Amino acid sequence: MADDKGTDPKEGCSDFIYLEAECSDISDLDNDLETLLEEGAGSDISDLINDEVVEQGNSRELLCQQEREESELQVQYLKRKCFSPKAVQELSPRLQSMNISSEHKSKRRLFVEQDSGLELSLNEAEDSTQELEVPASAPAPAAEGDIGLGTVRDLLRSSNSRATLLSKFKDSFGVSFTELTRQYKSNKTCCHHWVLAVYAAKDDLIDASKQLLQQHCFYIWLQSFCPMSLYLCCFNVGKSRDTVVRLIATLLQVHENHILSEPPKNRSIPAALFWYKGSLNSNVFCFGEAPDWILSQTMIQHQTADTLQFDLSRMIQWAYDNDHIDESIIAYQYAKLADIDSNAKAFLAHNSQVKYVKECALMVRYYKRGEMKEMSISAWIHHCISKVEGEGNWQHIVRFIRYQNLNFIMFLDKFRTFLKNLPKKNCLLIYGPPDTGKSMFAMSLIKLLKGSVVSFANSKSQFWLQPLADGKIGLLDDATDVCWQYIDSFLRNGLDGNLVSLDIKHKAPCQMKFPPLIITSNINLLKEERYRFLHSRVTQIDFPNKFPFDSDNKPLFELTDQSWASFFKRLWTQLELSDQEDEGDNGNSQRTFHCTAREVNGHI
C-alpha cells in the first residue's frame, strides 16, 4: 500500500501551523503602524496625490481652434470650384487689379437640359475664370518666414514681370505698349523694325547706345522717361527677337527680363502718328530717315486725294504687258508691287483676291488668244523674235541640218510649205534612231514661237487636242505605233488641212483647222504599208546621226532662241515670209494694246 500524502499524523500537527500561528500582541501592532506612518512622511513618494484646487487652462481654446481649422478646410474642399485660393493675388491685390485689356467671361448656354447633372458641371466649369488653382498649405512657421518670402518674390518676378513692365510703360508714356506693337509669338521670327521698352537702364549707357546702334540701324527713335526708355530701331537686316534682346541687353547692361520687344504696327495710322509727332519733340533722339510705313501714313501726298480702290483693269493690263498668264505667278508678282503700286496695295487689302486673280488670268488668256488669231504666221514669227534678247548665230542650225545629211535647200523648201500650213503639207515628221536630237530641235522651235504641245498619254481624254486651239504651231513628241494607229483612224482630216470639230472643255465643240504640226517618232512611215494613207499627208525628215557633245558634255550645236531668231532674220526672204510693212508694221511707233481706260493726265 502506498504512502499517504499530506502531513504526518503521528505528531498531531505539523510545524507549519505552529510557525504561522505565532503573532505579536495587538498593542505592539498599533505602535508599529504609527511608527510606519511617521517614518513614511519624509520618503521619496511623498505628495503623490495632489490635493490642491484644480484651475481650468487653455485646453478649450486649443480645441476650438482645431475644430475651426478643420471646419474651414472642409468648407474649402466643398467650395473649391467657386473659391480657389489665389496666392499671387493675395500677395499683391493692387498689382493684380491692373489689367491692360478687358477680360470677358465665356457666354453661358441659354438652354440647359436638366438630366444627369454632367452638363451642368461642364457649364459651371466653363463660366469660371480659367486660372491655376493653388492648393492650400499651412502657414510657414515664424522661423521660416524669410525663406517663404523669398520664394514668393521669385514667383512674382517670374510670372508678372511683363505685366509690371507694361504698367510702368503706360505710366511713363501715357500709351499702352500693345497699341504701338503687334505680337510675334515666336522668338525666331525675323523683322527689320523692332520696338523696345527697356526698364532701369543707366543714363550714360543710354547716351552711348545712340552712337553704338547707328552701325546696326538706318533709323533710330529714342525717348527716355525714368525708369523706362523707348526705342524704335529699323535694322539694316532682319533680326529675330532673341538677337535684338541680346544686343540691347549687352549695350545697356540690363537683364533680358527687363526688355519688352515687339515689331511695330506698320499699318496703324495712330501708331504712325505717335512716332511722327514724337520725332518733332526736342527730348526725342532721331537718327536717319523715317521708314516708309511712317511717311506713307503721315505725309500728305497726291495719292491720298483719291479713295484707295482696287481696279481690276489695271491688274489685267500689268499681267498682259508682262506676259503673265499663270494664276500663281500673277498673284505672287502683283503682291510684290504693293510697296510701290497703290492698286497692288488695294488688291492685298481686298477680301476677294482669289476671284480677281482667276478673272485676271482668264482675261489675259482671252486677249493673248485674240491677238494671236489676228496675226498671220509671218506677223507672229516677227512678234516672237522681236522679244528675244541677245544675239545668236544662225549657222548653228544650218550646220546641224547638214550634220544630219540633209540638203539645206530641200529642208528650206519643206519648212517653207510647212509654215504656210498648206493642205497635206502642214505635218512635218522628224524620225530617226534615239538620241539624234529630234526632240531638242523641235522643242527649241516650239519654245521660240510659243507653240502648244500635246501628249498622246492623255488620249483617253476627249480634250487632249484642246491646246492646239491656243497655238500658232503644235508639237506631238515621240509618237509610237499606238499613236500612229490613232492618227490613221481619227486625224486624217486634220492632216488634210480641212476643218475639224475640236472638243473644248466647258464649251461647245469648235470648228477649226489644225495649226502646223511637228511630230517626232522613231518609226519611218514610208516603210510601214499599213499607214499608206498617211504617206501623202506627212512630210518626213530623217535624223540618222546622234547628237554630238564636246568633252565637257555640252552640245556642239546651240539650238537656242537667239539662234532661231537669227535664222529667221537671215532667211526671211527665202522662207517667203511676208514683209511687215505690208501688214501695217512700220516700226514700234504704234500704241501697244491697252485694256484699261487711261486718263489723259494719268501716270505714265
Curated annotation (Swiss-Prot):
Post-translational modification: Phosphorylated.
One GO CC term on file: host cell nucleus
In-chain residues carrying the UniProt-annotated modification Phosphoserine: S84, S92
Region (DNA-binding region): 144-307
Top-level division of the source organism's lineage: Viruses
Covalent link (Glycyl lysine isopeptide (Lys-Gly) (interchain with G-Cter in SUMO)) residue numbers: K513
Protein localization: Host nucleus
Motif (Nuclear localization signal): 79-81
Cited InterPro entries: Helicase_SF3_DNA-vir (IPR014015), P-loop_NTPase (IPR027417), PPV_DNA_helicase_E1_C (IPR001177), PPV_DNA_helicase_E1_N (IPR014000), PPV_E1_DBD (IPR046832), PPV_E1_DBD_sf (IPR046935), Rep_E1_papillomaV (IPR016393), Znf_lg_T-Ag_D1_dom_sf (IPR037102)
GO BP annotations listed: DNA replication
Keyword annotations of the record: ATP-binding, DNA replication, DNA-binding, Early protein, Helicase, Host nucleus, Hydrolase, Isomerase, Isopeptide bond, Nucleotide-binding, Phosphoprotein, Ubl conjugation
Family: Belongs to the papillomaviridae E1 protein family.
Self-association state and partner proteins as the record states: Can form hexamers. Interacts with E2 protein; this interaction increases E1 DNA binding specificity. Interacts with host DNA polymerase subunit POLA2. Interacts with host single stranded DNA-binding protein RPA1. Interacts with host TOP1; this interaction stimulates the enzymatic activity of TOP1.
Protein name (record): Replication protein E1
Lineage: Viruses, Monodnaviria, Shotokuvirae, Cossaviricota, Papovaviricetes
Gene symbol of the encoding locus: E1
